[in-house]
A protein has these predicted regions:
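Structured loops at beta-to-helix junctions and adjacent beta-edge loops in soluble globular domains
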Residues: 27, 41, 99, 128, ...
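Positively charged, low-complexity intrinsically disordered regions
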Residues: 54, 94-96, 109, 194-195, ...
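Catalytic core of Fe(II)/2-oxoglutarate
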Residues: 135-235
Length: 236
């Protein structure tokens, strides 16, 4: 965990320090309805297989900012991104994590070892499924997120896993690399501040957490050559 001041001053304003953010609902409109009906028509064989996270992905946008044909099939989805999300974030790789009924997305870390210690905030929205089955692993006890039907920001650098305990697919929108907002990103921090003011009762922080014993084994295998960077890092 990072023991940092809870508040600080930036741009002449008292700010909350989000370096320990694990989960925060975001004060933006939810995406348009109707996506689930279309996603249900897509066969698993036509999705991207993610062996590391043990799930399938429906592509929404490439890293270069090009919307997929699937994204364009959902009425209003492209416009929602352009009007509500990219005004404070940026076009980046977006996918729909698809977890089958009874499925389990393996515990993982959504960044490379050389990015540990930086903000690894990820944007998410659950179109269908039990929101509380996103689970963050720590040394003392695992913690589930709240059941709030809102987009949210989560910490991709903290070990986490996901279950689907329903009899339908779970669909989770993800926005990730190369978007990597930091504490000097004024537009992004303003969204966090506004969201915290509205949803602070649901905010989850890692301030008093400890990483699980096996956390260094949870990175993607392709990053094994970077693990030496963490030899003296214990999350404190």
């Amino acid at each position: 965990m990072l023991l940092l001041k809870t508040e600080y001053t930036l741009w002449g304003v008292n700010m909350i320090n989000f370096s320990n953010l694990i989960y925060l609902p975001v004060d933006v409109p939810n995406p348009p309805k109707g996506a689930v009906e279309f996603f249900d028509t897509i066969d698993y064989k036509d999705m991207i297989v993610d062996t590391y996270r043990t799930c399938h992905h429906i592509p929404i946008m490439d890293k270069d900012g090009t919307f997929s044909s699937e994204a364009k099939e959902v009425k209003g989805l492209v416009e929602w991104f352009e009007n509500e999300i990219f005004t404070w974030s940026m076009p980046a790789r977006m996918r729909i994590i698809t977890t089958p009924p009874g499925g389990h997305n393996a515990c993982h870390i959504d960044c490379s070892p050389d990015r540990i210690g930086t903000w690894q905030h990820k944007f998410r929205y659950v179109f269908q499924g039990d929101r509380t089955t996103l689970i963050f692993n720590n040394k003392e006890e695992d913690v589930r997120i709240h059941d709030v039907d809102k987009c949210y920001i989560m910490d991709g650098a903290w070990p986490h896993e996901m279950l689907n305990t329903t009899n339908k697919r779970k669909y989770t929108l993800t926005l990730g690399a190369p978007w990597e907002p930091q504490s000097d990103d004024k537009k992004y921090v303003e969204v966090l501040q506004r969201s915290y003011s509205k949803y602070k009762n649901y905010y989850i922080s890692s301030e008093k957490w400890q990483l699980p014993e096996n956390w260094k084994s949870l990175f993607q295998p392709e990053y094994d050559d970077q693990l030496y960077l963490l030899e003296n890092y214990n999350g404190a």
